[in-house]
């Protein structure tokens, strides 16, 4: 699933082609995504795109009339192509631009979303209760320590909770906990302040590094130019269950936590 770095890489890739460009058409070939594409989404036709932003794993395409909200789901991708480019399987939506280009949404598994919001997007049900962005000053050690106080859930599940902090999915939660030396099953409310400070720092550092590397390509993700990301080459634990720890040489353990694969080193991340 594309996580925050992959969505941010996509935003950076498509923004120069979208901002200040007029939308001439919205072609919906298959509206049956995670939620049906609403007819009202076509209100973007004739509008000039003012900005392209990211909130968590959502892309926000702003116009004077409203905002298109895009979620890549499990396997979605956005590419900028000449509008005349032949359609391939799973190319569900084209946002056609006056420049002759199109923003094409491809989603094999159809867990993505393409929605429209006329309200300030902060009021939209999908966005209104999201936690802070991890790469901003709002996500800091005192905040996280307070957010986790008295929580008995595993720290990894809390780190992946969008109400606590947005965009830290399974890949980067595994990596950040390893870097901070915290066992993923540790009770969140019992992790001490020193470890929380290290964890916040590692989350920021790992996400920033992943963005710089173009995201993580494991199977489906490509950027707006169709190129893969290279952060997978730097993964220490995710997807490496049963292999040796890059830090101590011990075999990495793999368990299911919240139905997600969780890999850790039982020596470097003691419970």
Curated annotation (Swiss-Prot):
The keyword DNA-binding applies. PROSITE patterns: FPG_CAT (PS51068), ZF_FPG_1 (PS01242), ZF_FPG_2 (PS51066). InterPro entries: DNA_glyclase/AP_lyase_DNA-bd, DNA_glyclase_Znf_dom_DNA_BS, Formamido-pyr_DNA_Glyclase, FPG_cat, MutM-like_N-ter, Ribosomal_uS13-like_H2TH, Znf_DNA_glyclase/AP_lyase, Znf_FPG/IleRS. GO terms for molecular function: 8-oxo-7,8-dihydroguanine DNA N-glycosylase activity; class I DNA-(apurinic or apyrimidinic site) endonuclease activity; damaged DNA binding; zinc ion binding. Gene3D superfamilies: 1.10.8.50, MutM-like, N-terminal (3.20.190.10). Pfam families: Fapy_DNA_glyco, H2TH, zf-FPG_IleRS. Keywords: DNA damage, DNA repair, DNA-binding, Glycosidase, Hydrolase, Lyase, Metal-binding, Multifunctional enzyme, Zinc, Zinc-finger. DNA binds at residues 90, 109, 151. HAMAP family: Fapy_DNA_glycosyl. Belongs to the FPG family. This is Formamidopyrimidine-DNA glycosylase. The lineage of its organism: Bacteria, Pseudomonadati, Pseudomonadota, Gammaproteobacteria, Alteromonadales.
